[in-house]
């Protein structure tokens, strides 16, 4: 049910028609809308509950889209969407088919300036906007939250802010969290800069006392508030060294104080850092108690009763690739007493909490700093210590040069556990892990592989410590299984593929979890009288050239199947192999087309790009002219 005030807010202009006294009720309605929606769809919950009052205040004081808001990270923009004409059925389906993106998207609204999904870029983008065009009477407001302020790119941009840049307000949404608790010196430093709570309490008492004095007018009260803001701006000189005027901190949940404070900094002829303190998960008791757990949720309500998803330590039998990785790393930690694990702010998502708790001195979360995570891991490896760098595929893109310069060029045996390889579905274009093979396979010394199930994953992780070379083990966030329960197994070495089944008419090479799809296609082709050899290459680089040459001696028709961009993946490596060995064969390459893939449900996305088993079967029949395509 749409709320009484919120249902009338079709634009920020409509918001500004409300009185100040109505805004707290509106904030409650917004929270209820977000909680009710995400209980059915899942999404980024805690961050958006924490930014409600701040977003309402920003839209109340400034005039978007003339005043430009840039959210960092973009997942904290749900409130912004509700206030900018998107409180519709599309919001009710957020991150799903026919729904809004879970991040800012210019395709949805001119109130969204950029697509956003990765952290730390807002300040650079905002400075570019200011440099590239005269914004006249308009303001530019990068809104930094969830540890975006401590990203290296943010600090680089901070060093580049002109001291005479007017109408430029950096809003720091300080919730002392990223996805989980902040790490490192910068967030701790910010906490130390915050004024003691006693200061605000004393000032409130003075204000309350003075209001009782006869003749104390509203104008004098406003003047006193301006004195409060001035004192807040004088108390922390650090940003002044950057030429940035600091104001704060302010209570991010007191909208009646936020609005006059924002009015006071509006139109200033120099850059301002507006520091707001919020509580991630505010307004939902469970999320306030455990904001990390409620950062990103699945549909977690049943009969309006919150259902907690289990922490990794509560998972007795791993069922997904990330859970198996977390379990195997704990086994490796026991076997190798010097093994180190490094991650850039993805301990919970990548199921590393058990390792962190079991081996706290051998676990490092570097925060949202992917380049540093890679180079830090390189330093560990150079010391002779085994190290696993656990990182999402989409975030590894940000550290490509670190992989090249600090790992591969140095020939250091860093083991990259690359999570979320493949389609991210609900998170959309910024989070699909479908581009990493293009640069990983181009780097000398790098071994690249992908397991089809938990058994192969286990062999790869245990064996990778024997390879003594940089290696990337990529895997999706999908359910998987172990084929055997026997803990003893033989090691596997780079360039070893596996034949899953033999046939005479077609060779089907499928990468990782796509082997399951390939085996389903094999059965469908059998209905057409076509027998298929299915091969799991395991290694994209190096390929098992000996096995492939043997198979190609009696297969003239080949299909390469992968959930990766058709450019730069397994198919590209296979075609290079054919060219290098002067082999001629008919190859059908099936992968992800050269477009940005939107968000949506798995079935919808796979159908859109033609990677369902039915579609693959029809493409094979048509391409090789086995028979006229028959709908299945």
Swiss-Prot record:
Reactions accelerated catalytically: D-glyceraldehyde 3-phosphate + pyruvate + H(+) = 1-deoxy-D-xylulose 5-phosphate + CO2
GO (cellular component) term, any one: cytosol
GO biological process: 1-deoxy-D-xylulose 5-phosphate biosynthetic process; isopentenyl diphosphate biosynthetic process, methylerythritol 4-phosphate pathway; terpenoid biosynthetic process; thiamine biosynthetic process
Binding residues for Mg(2+): 146, 175
Keyword Cytoplasm appears in the UniProt entry: no
Cofactor(s) listed: Mg(2+); thiamine diphosphate
Sites where the protein binds thiamine diphosphate: 75, 117-119, 147-148, 175, 370
Cofactor note: Binds 1 Mg(2+) ion per subunit.
Keywords (A to Z) from UniProt: Isoprene biosynthesis, Magnesium, Metal-binding, Thiamine biosynthesis, Thiamine pyrophosphate, Transferase
Keyword hit for Magnesium: yes
GO MF: 1-deoxy-D-xylulose-5-phosphate synthase activity; magnesium ion binding; thiamine pyrophosphate binding
Pathway linked to the protein: Metabolic intermediate biosynthesis; 1-deoxy-D-xylulose 5-phosphate biosynthesis; 1-deoxy-D-xylulose 5-phosphate from D-glyceraldehyde 3-phosphate and pyruvate: step 1/1
Enzyme class, UniProt record, top EC level: transferase
UniProt similarity note: Belongs to the transketolase family. DXPS subfamily.
Assembly and binders: Homodimer.
Function: Catalyzes the acyloin condensation reaction between C atoms 2 and 3 of pyruvate and glyceraldehyde 3-phosphate to yield 1-deoxy-D-xylulose-5-phosphate (DXP).
Protein name in UniProt: 1-deoxy-D-xylulose-5-phosphate synthase
């Amino acid at each position: 049910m749409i709320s009484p005030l919120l249902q009338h807010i079709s634009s920020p202009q409509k918001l500004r028609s409300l009185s100040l006294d109505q805004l707290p009720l509106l904030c409650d309605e917004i929270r209820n809308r977000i909680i009710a929606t995400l209980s059915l769809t899942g999404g980024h919950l805690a961050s958006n509950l924490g930014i409600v009052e701040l977003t309402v205040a920003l839209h109340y004081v400034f005039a978007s889209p003339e005043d430009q808001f840039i959210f960092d990270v973009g997942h904290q923009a749900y409130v912004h969407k509700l206030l900018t004409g998107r409180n519709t059925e599309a919001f009710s389906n957020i991150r799903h088919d026919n729904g809004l993106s879970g991040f800012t998207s210019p395709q949805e609204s001119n109130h969204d300036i950029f697509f956003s999904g990765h952290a730390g870029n807002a300040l650079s983008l905002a400075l570019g906007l200011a440099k590239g065009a005269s914004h006249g009477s308009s303001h530019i407001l990068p809104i930094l939250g969830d540890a975006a302020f401590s990203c290296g790119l943010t600090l680089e941009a901070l060093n580049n802010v002109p001291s005479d840049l007017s109408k430029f307000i950096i809003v720091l949404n300080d919730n002392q969290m990223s996805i989980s608790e902040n790490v490192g010196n910068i967030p701790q430093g910010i906490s130390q800069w915050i004024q003691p709570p006693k200061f605000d309490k004393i000032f409130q008492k003075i204000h309350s006392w003075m209001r009782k004095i006869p003749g104390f007018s509203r104008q004098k009260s406003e003047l006193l508030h301006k004195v409060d803001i001035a004192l807040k701006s004088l108390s922390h000189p650090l940003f002044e060294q950057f030429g940035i005027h600091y104001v704060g901190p302010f209570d991010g949940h007191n909208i009646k104080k936020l609005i006059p404070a924002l009015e006071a900094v509006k139109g200033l002829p120099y850059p301002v850092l507006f520091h707001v303190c919020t509580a991630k998960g505010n307004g939902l008791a469970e999320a306030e108690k455990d904001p990390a757990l409620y950062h990103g949720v699945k549909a977690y309500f049943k009969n309006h009763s919150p259902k907690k998803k289990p922490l990794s330590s509560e998972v007795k039998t791993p069922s997904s690739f990330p859970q198996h990785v977390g379990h195997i790393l704990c086994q490796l930690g026991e076997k190798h007493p010097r093994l180190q694990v490094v991650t850039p702010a993805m301990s919970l998502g990548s199921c590393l909490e058990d390792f962190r708790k079991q081996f706290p001195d051998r676990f490092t979360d570097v925060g949202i700093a992917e380049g540093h995570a890679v180079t830090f891991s390189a330093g560990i490896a150079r010391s002779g210590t085994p190290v696993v760098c656990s990182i999402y595929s989409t975030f590894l893109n940000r550290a490509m040069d670190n992989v090249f310069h600090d790992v591969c060029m140095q020939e250091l045996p860093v083991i990259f556990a690359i999570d979320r390889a493949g389609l991210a579905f609900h998170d959309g274009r910024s989070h699909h892990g479908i581009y990493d093979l293009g640069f990983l396979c181009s780097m000398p010394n790098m071994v690249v592989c992908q397991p089809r199930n938990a058994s192969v994953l286990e062999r790869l992780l245990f064996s990778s410590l024997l390879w003594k070379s940089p290696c990337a083990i990529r895997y999706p966030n999908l359910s998987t299984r172990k084929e055997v329960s026997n803990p003893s197994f033989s090691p596997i070495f780079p360039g070893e593929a596996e034949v899953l089944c033999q046939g005479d008419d077609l060779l089907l090479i499928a990468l990782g979890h796509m082997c399951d799809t390939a085996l389903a296609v094999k059965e469908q082709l059998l209905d057409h009288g076509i027998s298929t050899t299915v091969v799991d290459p395991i290694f994209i680089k190096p390929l098992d050239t000996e096995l492939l040459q043997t198979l190609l001696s009696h297969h003239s028709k080949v299909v390469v199947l992968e959930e990766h961009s058709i450019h730069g993946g397994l198919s590209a490596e296979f075609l290079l192999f054919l060219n290098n060995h002067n082999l001629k064969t008919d190859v059908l390459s099936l992968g992800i087309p050269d477009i940005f893939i939107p968000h949506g449900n798995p079935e919808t996305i796979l159908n859109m790009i033609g990677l369902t088993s039915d579609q693959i079967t029809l493409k094979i029949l048509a391409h090789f002219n086995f028979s006229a395509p028959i709908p299945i």
